[in-house]
C-alpha cells in the first residue's frame, strides 16, 4: 500500500452501486446493532441517494471516489454552500481503515479550506468514537451537541469562523 498513490476523483454515475456498498461496509457494524435494521432496504436507499448525488441532483454536493493503488476503497462527499466546506460523508472500506487514509483525505479537504479561507464542518455519530478521535486529532472541535450526533468545526486559518 502506497499512500502516495491516493487519489480523490469525481464519482461517475456507474459507480453509484460501489458508493452505496462502501457506505454500508464502513457502517455495517454500528448499523446492525439496531434490531430493526433492514440491510436490503438500507442498501436500496443508499443506492438511490448515490444515484441522485452523482447525477448532480443534490445542490452544492460533490461526491468523490477514493482510490488507492488503482483500487476504489472509499467515498468522500462534501457540500459547498459558499461559507464553509461541509464534509457530508467519508467512508473507507473496513479493510483499509486505520492506515492513515482518512487522515490524508481529510488533510486534502483542509488544504482546500485553507486556500479558500473557509471553515470545515462535519458531523460524527456519538456511537463512532474512533472517527471523533481522528477529527479531534486533526483540530476539529465540537461546535454543537445534537441528539445522536455532534457537529464539529475546524476554523479557517485566519481565525474567523465565518
For the regions a protein language model found, what residue spans apply to each?
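Conserved beta-strand-loop-alpha-helix junction that forms the acyl-donor binding cleft
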Residues: 94-97, 122-132, 148-157
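Conserved beta-strand in the GNAT
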Residues: 65, 71-79, 86, 91
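Conserved N-terminal entry element of GNAT/NAT acetyltransferase domains
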Residues: 1-17, 156-162
